[in-house]
Each structure stands twice: as C-alpha cells, then as structure tokens.
C-alpha cells in the first residue's frame, strides 16, 4: 500500500503574496526547504497530491491563463528535481459558495477514498491554514500546519519529513477471540528489556529471547484457555506477534530483508562462501535460521524433540508457533536444529530466529529491497 502526502499549494509549496494570487512569474517563490524535504519523503515511499483552493479562478479578477503559467513552471521545477505529483486538484469556488469540493470539504477526494491501494494510516496533509488541518481531520489522516507569521502553525518542512520518513517502527496488536486475549507491543527501533506474561513460564522465557536477541522492545500479554490446553495461547501469540512485525515494518523500505549467517561467522568452514542460516550454538546444540520478509509466508522446520514437553510448553507446538509467525507476518523461515537436550534445542531455535530477525529488520537506507516494486 502507498501513503499519500496531500499538500496545499500557496503558502505550503510556494510562498503566498499579499493579494493571495500567484498570477505572475515574478511572484513565484518556493517555501524554504520544501524540495529536499519532499525528496526525502519520496524516497520513503510517499506519493504527492496537490489540493488547493483558488478563489474565483477563471473569473475576470483571476484569469485562468494568469494562473497556469506560474503553476506550470512550479510543476516543471519540481519535476526537474525528481518530484512528480500524482494529481493536482483545484477548487475554483468562492468561500461564500460553501462548495463541498472546497477545503475543508473532501468532495475532491471521492476517487481516493475508493482506492484500496492507499495506506491511509501513513498518509498526511500539509498546509498553512487551519482549513488544511480540518481537511485532514475530515479524511481521518494526520495534519501538519506549517509555521507562518499570518496563520501560526508549528511545523517546518524538515521537521515534517523527519516525522513521517524517520518515524519509529512501532505496532500494537490486540487479538481477541473466544479462546484468547493477546496484546503485543513492539518498537523495532528501541532496545528495552522484554516483558512477557502468558501464563506459561517457559514460553515466556522463550519469547523474551526474541526481544532480547532481536534487539528491539517487545511486550506480550496473553490470557488464554489454559484450563483446556496450551495450544490456543501459543498459536495466537505467534499470530499476534507476526501481525505486529508486519505492521511495524510497513512498506519495508531500507530494511535488510534477509537474515542469514554472515561470511565472517566462526561456525563456517574456511572458504565457504555459500549463504546459510544464522547459526548459533548452545552447548551440544546448534540451530540455524534463514529468513526473508518476502511477503510470501513459508516455513520449513528440520529437527526432532524426544520429550513431549519442555517445562509447560509442548514440543509439538514449537514449530507450530514459528509457522504462526510466518503466516501472519508474510515471513519465509527455514529453521534447523540438532542436539541432545530438548531444552537447549527449543531455546536455540528462538535465539537463532531472533538473531536472524535482528539482521533482517535493520535499516540500511531508503531503497525497497526488491525489483518488484513492492514486498
């Protein structure tokens, strides 16, 4: 899904003169820092749509020809710097007309409201007037009012770009069914001690490994029908955690995408250049996890357990938990474990996944790590 930045024109992209009409080339002047800020937002995956009220455009006092020359030059300058607008929406009514297409009305937005490819949660509106903020409120998106002497406001373009493009990757997922109530909170850009409470102490200990060794803040609270058995609690926790990972990663721009064993790993055979899963030992046990946030869920598990359960966690639910994460997050995971002690083997699986996640979620720029254009 694609986020859209709706932008006002006069006073937002270009400065607004005293007569409120940019009807001559000499009146055309860009707002400070607008181009580098929009380039940053473009690289973060945003598309741009101009939404502007132009009082009485086409009337004798404001001929369309006087408007189009400076407007076309503005668009050409933006295009020369790599900034293209998906659409330019102009309302030509007068304030007294109370037209539904005039901001803060959203009459011009009908085609966009019907477009299911838009990421409305990340979309926003930037303008210099309170009507722009009201327009954002009517669309149920975030609004940023640029700081001006005439209308106030608190934001400048660099701050808006930072807020939208560098926003922390957070998610809160609440999954409620007749069998369980699961709440997962995570922040992929903050390190904190994990907090877990599922009613299953050994499972809690394993979940803590994901946050601790994954290098991100993780909090999980679960209430399930443990009087029946552990299945629903463990399965639904995996589904909620997978959904939280998917939501926090967003469009996945800039992430490593893959988690695997680096060539410098001490566990590699000398001269081995092939890509392997992220491998780690735990006493006699060795586990390997290779993953890809491809958007196509797939899980392969290679390992066996001798015991029916470790602590309060049935060993048959270990691969099932990982499969649930994959299904909900769109993750491709290959997980292998060898050893003698089942406690070590289960814990090594969780730690291997966590270390592979740490590598895959790391930001390495702004590019989308695929040739398809979407993940």
From Swiss-Prot:
Pathway: Amino-acid biosynthesis; L-histidine biosynthesis; L-histidine from 5-phospho-alpha-D-ribose 1-diphosphate: step 6/9; Amino-acid biosynthesis; L-histidine biosynthesis; L-histidine from 5-phospho-alpha-D-ribose 1-diphosphate: step 8/9. Its EC number is 3.1.3.15, 4.2.1.19. It comes from the Bacteria. GO terms for biological process: L-histidine biosynthetic process. InterPro entries: HAD-like_sf (IPR036412), HAD-SF_hydro_IIIA (IPR006549), HAD_sf (IPR023214), His_synth_bifunc_HisB (IPR020566), HisB_N (IPR005954), Histidinol-phos (IPR006543), IGPD_sf (IPR038494), ImidazoleglycerolP_deHydtase (IPR000807). The keyword Cytoplasm applies. In the N-terminal section; belongs to the histidinol-phosphatase family. In the C-terminal section; belongs to the imidazoleglycerol-phosphate dehydratase family. This is Histidine biosynthesis bifunctional protein HisB. The gene is hisB.
């Amino acid at each position: 899904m694609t986020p859209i930045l709706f932008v006002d024109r006069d006073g937002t992209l270009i400065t607004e003169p005293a007569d409120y009409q940019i009807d001559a080339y000499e009146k055309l002047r860009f707002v400070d820092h607008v181009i580098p800020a929009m380039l940053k937002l473009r690289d973060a995956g945003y598309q741009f749509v101009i939404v502007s009220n132009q009082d009485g455009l086409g009337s004798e006092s404001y001929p369309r020809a006087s408007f189009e020359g400076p407007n076309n030059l503005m668009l050409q300058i933006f295009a020369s710097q790599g900034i293209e607008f998906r659409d330019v929406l102009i309302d030509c009514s007068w304030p007294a007309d109370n037209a539904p297409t005039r901001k803060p009305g959203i009459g011009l937005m009908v085609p966009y409201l019907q477009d299911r490819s838009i990421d409305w949660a990340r979309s926003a509106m930037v303008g210099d007037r309170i009507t722009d903020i009201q327009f954002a409120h009517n669309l149920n998106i975030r609004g940023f009012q640029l700081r001006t002497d005439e209308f106030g406001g608190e934001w400048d373009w660099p701050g808006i770009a930072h807020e939208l493009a560098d926003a922390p990757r957070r998610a809160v997922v609440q999954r409620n069914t007749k069998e369980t109530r699961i709440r997962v909170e995570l922040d992929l850009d903050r390190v904190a001690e994990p907090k877990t409470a599922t009613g299953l102490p050994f499972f809690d200990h394993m979940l803590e490994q994901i946050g601790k060794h994954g290098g991100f803040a993780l909090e999980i609270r679960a209430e399930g029908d443990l009087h029946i058995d552990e299945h629903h609690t463990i399965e639904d926790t995996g589904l909620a955690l997978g959904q939280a990972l998917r939501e926090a990663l967003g469009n996945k721009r800039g992430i490593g995408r893959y988690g695997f064993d680096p060539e410098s790993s001490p566990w590699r055979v000398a001269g081995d250049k092939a890509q392997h899963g992220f491998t780690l030992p735990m006493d006699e046990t060795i586990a390997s996890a290779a993953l890809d946030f491809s958007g196509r869920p797939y899980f392969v598990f290679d390992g066996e357990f001798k015991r029916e359960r470790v602590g309060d966690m049935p060993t048959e639910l270990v691969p099932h938990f990982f499969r649930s994460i994959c299904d909900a997050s769109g993750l491709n995971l290959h997980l292998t474990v060898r050893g003698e002690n089942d406690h070590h083997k289960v814990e090594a699986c969780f730690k291997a996944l966590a270390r592979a996640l740490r590598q895959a979620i790391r930001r390495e720029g702004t590019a989308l790590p695929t040739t398809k254009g979407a993940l």
